[in-house]
């Protein structure tokens, strides 16, 4: 069964719902442009109220290593998720687990674009030609996992639009990511109705959901419970 992260937590109530439903990790977004942005002091208060054995993930975009380090310390984060065009090597000195996010347009499918993306980018086209080389060159402690997310209309993450899991191009890219040896975390338009199919088609180490467990822009307790219940089911072969 994949590990489950509920992202975009903004209140103690939302955190409690996710913890009680069995989430493995909670995500706190420290990117100021995000509508799910949370002040570090608020995140710290929520984190201090959590039960043990839940991972605390800070989501950043284009933040300096110094800024990230301060929030890691202030909020007692154990994982950081980088959502910009950061070079993961700049954060290797931080004693936390590091996840690098890549975003793809939901249509056309990855691999259909003619342009390769720059290394370490949050991309608008498939990085299939540059990603493997870039990540094989990373030194130890620079990266511990890769997250795949969707983008649409210039927005990356939290779009509610699924990735094209079924397409041969996307499946080929998944194999390339798998060859790198990093755990794969799947995001992008996941919800209680499609999570089983997404797991069956991608076999991820973990899944990450935000908008898929929201109602009217806020986390919904029943949707969180339903999502986690579905994700915990044994996926069909």
Curated annotation (Swiss-Prot):
It catalyses: N-(5-phospho-beta-D-ribosyl)anthranilate = 1-(2-carboxyphenylamino)-1-deoxy-D-ribulose 5-phosphate. Gene3D superfamilies: Aldolase class I (3.20.20.70). Keywords: Amino-acid biosynthesis, Aromatic amino acid biosynthesis, Isomerase, Tryptophan biosynthesis. GO terms for biological process: L-tryptophan biosynthetic process. It is an enzyme of class 5 (isomerase). InterPro entries: Aldolase_TIM (IPR013785), PRAI_dom (IPR001240), RibuloseP-bd_barrel (IPR011060), TrpF_fam (IPR044643). Pfam families: PRAI. Its EC number is 5.3.1.24. GO terms for molecular function: phosphoribosylanthranilate isomerase activity. Pathway: Amino-acid biosynthesis; L-tryptophan biosynthesis; L-tryptophan from chorismate: step 3/5. Belongs to the TrpF family. PANTHER family: N-(5'-PHOSPHORIBOSYL)ANTHRANILATE ISOMERASE. This is N-(5'-phosphoribosyl)anthranilate isomerase.
């Amino acid at each position: 069964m994949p590990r489950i992260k509920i992202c975009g937590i903004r209140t103690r109530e939302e955190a409690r719902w996710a913890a009680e439903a069995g989430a493995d990790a909670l995500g706190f977004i420290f990117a100021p442009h995000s509508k799910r942005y949370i002040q570090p002091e608020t995140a710290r208060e929520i984190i201090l109220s959590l039960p043990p054995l839940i991972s605390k993930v800070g989501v950043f975009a284009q933040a300096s290593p110094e800024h990230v380090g301060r929030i890691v310390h202030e909020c007692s984060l154990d994982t950081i998720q980088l959502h910009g065009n950061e070079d993961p090597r700049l954060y290797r000195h931080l004693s936390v687990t590091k996840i690098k996010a890549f975003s793809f347009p939901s249509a056309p499918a990855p691999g259909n674009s003619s342009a390769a993306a720059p290394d370490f980018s949050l991309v608008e086209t498939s990085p299939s030609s540059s990603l493997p080389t870039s990540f094989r060159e990373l030194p130890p402690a620079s990266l511990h996992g890769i997250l795949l997310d969707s983008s649409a209309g210039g927005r990356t993450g939290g779009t509610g639009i699924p990735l094209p899991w079924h397409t041969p191009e996307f499946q080929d890219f998944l194999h390339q990511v798998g060859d790198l040896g990093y755990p794969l975390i799947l995001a992008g338009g996941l919800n209680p109705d499609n999570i089983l199919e997404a797991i069956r088609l991608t076999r991820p180490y973990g899944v990450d959901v935000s908008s898929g467990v929201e109602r009217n822009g806020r986390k919904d307790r029943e949707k969180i419970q339903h999502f986690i219940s579905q994700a915990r089911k044994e996926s069909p072969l």
